[in-house]
Every structure is written in C-alpha cells, then in structure tokens.
C-alpha cells in the first residue's frame, strides 16, 4: 500500500484547504497518509496522522506551497531521499510540478503509476565541518548592508578570480532559475553536470558568471579582515564566515528526488519565466 506525506504552508488558508481535500481524497482511495504535525494544528481532524517532518517515512511527499516549501522539506528529509511532488501555491514555483486546479487529476495519475522520479544534483558545503547540502544555491553575503566582501575564488586549487562584491552565489542547475538568474547567471538545463559561480554586484567590470564542471571542487575565501560574512544555504540555514575562512563546495553523493508528470523542462521555462511567470508579475 502506498504511503504519502502531506506538507503545506499552514499560514496560507488556501494551502491548508487543499491539504484537507488531498488528505480526504487519498484516504478514500485506501492510501496511507502522514501529515506534518504543525499542519494538524490547523486541521485537528487529521491529528491521528500527524508526524514531525524529520520522522516521515513515506513513498512520496506532497508539498503544498511554493519553492520555499520544497526547499524546507528537502532540507528536513535530506537523508531519506523521498520523492517530492510540489503543488504550486507560490508566485513562480519552478520546482513545483502541479498547479492547484490540476491537483486531483495529478494524484489520479500518481495512483496509476503514471509518473517518473527525477534526480537532481545537490551541492555539498563545508566550513570547518560539513554543513547541510544545497539543492538551489549557497549565497555568501556580508552581514552588514551596503558593505562589500573581498573574496578569492578557486576551482580545483587554481585561483580563477579575486574581487570585491556584495556577495557570491554558488548554484546548481536547479538553482539557475532562482537567485542566480536574478543576479545575471544563465539558465542551465538540470541535466547539465555543472555548477555556477555568480558574483553579486561585483566592483569589477570583468567579473562575470562562470559555469564549471560539477566534478570540480570550488573554494571561496574571505580575504578582508574585519568583514564577516554569512553563508545562506537554500534560504534555510545560515553559517557565519570569518576573515580568511574558506568555504568548500563539491558535488554531493546524495540526490534530491522529484515526482515528474512530464519531462518538458523548456516548456516550464517558457510558462513560468517568460509567457506567464516572472515577466507578468506586477507589484
């Protein structure tokens, strides 16, 4: 019997409502469910199914929210590699797979086994010890607004750039459509075995984004004394970086797993980022 986890933004009424309807739909079809314990505070009728996300044991997890909900969920179940099916309640939701109006037809397809599991590259991060891995990106930025960092970037022990900038983004192909894109980085097909190095507002005309092999080891060193920085991993975790500290990035041995009902990456680029996505968002 299939077991499906349900996680939703409990601060968004529509997401909570969809979670309730999804739970009822699955139970009526004989599917076992487990529900985020915090979500059951909004849906007390599902309390018997409540479980901490970290302890969830499921064949698949449904997230009802945006990309942030997916990133948070993935960080909490990192060691389990449970496939995630994202239902989009956010603005763009590039990591999500299903819009709210198609939720139940998508679930019918899932129950018929008409889906694939896509594996996405993760970025391992080290600062003294191993930090949580990143699905999208790691952002190194100053702790103080309007202050620049002085950083050295090395790839496979070769210095490729030294610059002053507001920060630096180390991104995966999955993250190429997120903060990296906003900072001027390219969109990269998730099948490409690469990492992106994207400066944020560099004080150097020649500084440009770099695309490097994901077999490479990237090192970023903070050079200027007295300028502390923070490393932000997928917007979920922060680590303080001090003068002459080095942050190391390499491809993780683990993967993130996503439920996919279609494989058209470029259709998603058109729909979410051009035709009906970012370019059409107002105010």
Swiss-Prot record:
Question: Do the record's keywords include DNA repair?
Answer: no
Pfam families, alphabetized: NAD_kinase (PF01513), NAD_kinase_C (PF20143)
According to its UniProt entry, one GO biological process term is: NAD metabolic process
Q: Which residues form the active site?
A: 67
Q: Can you name this protein? A: NAD kinase
Q: Return the SUPFAM superfamilies for the record.
A: NAD kinase/diacylglycerol kinase-like
- UniProt keyword annotations, A-Z: ATP-binding, Cytoplasm, Kinase, NAD, NADP, Nucleotide-binding, Transferase
GO CC terms on record? cytoplasm
In the record, what lineage is assigned to the organism producing the protein? Archaea, Methanobacteriati, Methanobacteriota, Methanomada group, Methanobacteria
Which family, according to UniProt? Belongs to the NAD kinase family.
Organism per entry: Methanothermobacter thermautotrophicus (strain ATCC 29096 / DSM 1053 / JCM 10044 / NBRC 100330 / Delta H) (Methanobacterium thermoautotrophicum)
Required cofactor(s): a divalent metal cation
